[in-house]
A protein has these predicted regions:
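Glycine/small-residue-rich pyrophosphate-binding loop that anchors the diphosphate of NDP-sugar donors
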Residues: 90
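C-terminal/domain-terminus segments
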Residues: 100-128
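Mid/C-terminal beta-alpha module of Rossmann-like enzyme folds, strongest
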Residues: 1-82, 95, 118, 124
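A conserved mid-domain beta-alpha-beta active-site/ligand-binding segment of alpha/beta enzyme cores
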Residues: 85-86
Length: 128
């Protein structure tokens, strides 16, 4: 992070790094579904790493059908990390007081950031 490396007030400081807003997955799912022109499904309490373990051939078919770059699913997603991110039994609320006092002012809208990043992946033919 260039800002932390070049800002004297940031020297030797621990910071929480978040977008600056509070969001929940239940609020993001409709946006993600809309991005992919899909309906929102029901809540499932399964591990993605288990449910996706045998889906590499399905991804290969999707990639072929949409003329995507040839990436193995395992090259572009880490299922255990998604399981961690999806399975929090609590809201992630991190204080940005320390980083704000050091001079950081940027705030990102999580919904916009997620869809912007997905659009970049789509534009680069990594996802359909």
């Amino acid at each position: 992070m260039v800002w932390a490396a070049t800002t004297p007030t940031a020297a030797n400081q621990p910071f929480n790094i978040t977008n600056g807003d509070y969001t929940r997955w239940k609020l993001l799912w409709p946006k993600l579904a809309a991005f992919f022109d899909m309906e929102v499904g029901n809540v499932q309490t399964v591990k993605t790493q288990d449910i996706m373990a045998d889906k590499e051939p399905v991804w290969a078919e999707i990639a072929e059908a949409h003329q995507l770059r040839k990436y193995a699913m395992s090259d572009i997603v880490t299922w255990p990390f998604l399981d961690y991110a999806f399975a929090n039994g609590f809201d992630q609320m991190s204080s940005l007081t320390n980083i704000r006092q050091a001079g950081w002012t940027e705030v990102l809208d999580t919904e916009a950031t997620v869809t912007d990043q997905l659009q970049k992946l789509r534009d680069n033919r990594i996802i359909p």
